Amino acid sequence: MKHSVHEDKSDYFSNHTPAGKETRLPEDCVKPTRETCLPEDCVNPTRETCLPKDCVKPLLETRFVKVFDLQYEDGKHYYDATRHSSGDIAATKNEAAFSEMFPDAVSCVVILCLPNREPLLLFSYEYRYTVGRYLLSVPAGLIDPKDKESSTRDEALINTAVRELREETGIEIKSEDKVTVINPCLFSTPGMTDESNALVCAVVHTDNLHELSQKGAVGSEKFDGFALFTKEEAAAVLRNGVDPNGHFYSVYTLAALLYFVADLWK
């Protein structure tokens, strides 16, 4: 745990300012702020700084990815790679819409409970085209529009998780299993994209690991087997910072390892 150290600087300026020296900043050194694209009604004491939709300019639009120029300030450009239309990106949402937004996808922390064995954390090796390798990955998938028709956001996220587990692992969720939402919306890399994932935990009771299957992969999905870790083995992957193949892994794999090792699923 990190502890903040607060230095008492109450006498700093009095002790370091020459006697009689004017310390106030001259008025001619104060420059007016640049005119921005944000209207006054979009900046309030709650720090709501939603971007007006007319300040979002399209640069690239493909089936799966779009890139927009977010013009918060004249002459400055911030680029957002997103799955959303210009009117639905996170930057344009007010506080109410932002707090209720759906993530793009669901990532699953999957823990297998077997008779007379310690629990195991389940991963797959999935090919990730942007890094050109099979990475240690959690089961995950995009939320379908039909999922959003559920009565609550959590229900929609759980429905997505159940479907993805079936497709990517062959696991069928049963009544004795437990599927819960850990976090409804996590940003992956907010410095360049508003892509987001929910994190869902599935505690699955099984007595047959041979039922695991990746035959349900769809589209461009490519898998190369599973990885099962005990708590001790998962902790070793955390300490090493790479998977057993020596490859780095995603932040969602890191989250799954931490959640499992810390026993937060119990």
PLM features: residue spans?
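N-terminal leader/linker segments that precede catalytic domains of diphosphate-processing enzymes
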Residues: 1-135, 142-167, 171-212, 231-232, ...
